[in-house]
Amino acid sequence: MKFYIILLFMIIAILSFSQTAPKLFMPKVFEGLPNIRDIAISPNNEEIYFTIDDYKYKIGVIACIQKQKNGWSKPKVVSFSGNFRDIEPAFSSDGNILYFSSNRPLDKDSTTIKDYDIWYVERNNSKSPWSSPKNLGKPINTTGDEFYPSITENGDIYFTSSREGTKGKEDIFVSRLKNNAYTKPESLSEGVNTANYEFNAYVSPKEDFIIFTSIRKGEGSGRGDLYISFKEKNKKWSKAILLETISSSALDYCPFVDIKNNKLYFTSSRSAIKNYYSKRLSYSDILRIYNEEPSGKSRLYTIPFVIENFKKQ
C-alpha cells in the first residue's frame, strides 16, 4: 500500500511539472531558421509577428504568420522589413499600429545604419497593408539606443534605454501619451530598476504588472532571468520576483503575455546538449543533437500563465 501511495505522489509530481515546464512554441514553423526571438500576437489572435535574427545579429527581419482554416500560414517577411536589423515588434491595443526597434537610418535614401530607435507602422484594419515606417522621434528616441517597446491600452509606451537618468546600466522607461504627445520618459521605480541591467519589458495593457529581464548576481542564472513586478496602490512598482519555474542557465528574455488565453511567451537560448556523453558520438549523432531542439539556438517558448498565482507570492 505504501508503495502505491509513493507512486501516486510521483505521478502527480511528474504531471504537475509537465504542465508548468516551458515548451517550445511552434517548433516545426521555425525549423531550419537561425535565431528566432520576440513575439507579438495581434489583439484578435489572428496574426503572430516575430523576429528572424542571424547568428551574428547583423541583420534581423520581422516576419508574420496568419491564422487560416487549417492552422497557420508559412512565415512571410513583412512589407516594411528586410533591409536593416528590425526587431522587437509590439502591437497597439487596437492592432492597427505596430511598433518595433530598428537601426535603419532616418534618411530613407541612406544605407548607413545608426543607433537603435523605436519606429512604427500603421494600417486601417487587419486586412489592409502597413504604411511606410515612421520614426517615433523625441523625447523617446535619442542618439543612444532604444529597445523593446510595450504599449498600454491608453497609449503609454514602455521601453529599454541606457540614457541619462538610469539607476544603473540599462533601465526600463515609460513615456505617457498626453494630448497626442509623449511626455519626457521616466525611469521606473526601484522595484524594477536597480544598479544592474533591466531590459525588454512587457507591461500589461492596464499596467497592473510588468515582466522583464534582469542580470543580477546571486539571483537566478546570472545570464538574464525573467522577473515580475506589480503596480502598488501608491503607483510604484513592487519589488520584482524572480520567475524561478521559467529560469534556465541561458538568457531568458523578450516576454509577452496573451492575457485572453493565460499564456506567457518568451525567448530563450537554452540547450539540452550535454557536456558529456557515455556513448561516443558519431557524425550522425552530432547532426541529430544539433538539429533537435532545444540546441542553444534562440527560440520561442510558452508556458501557462495565471497572473493571480503570482500575486499570492
Question: Language-model segments: which ranges?
Answer:
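Bacterial Sec-dependent N-terminal signal peptides
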Residues: 1-21
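Short, conserved micro-motifs composed of acidic
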Residues: 19-313
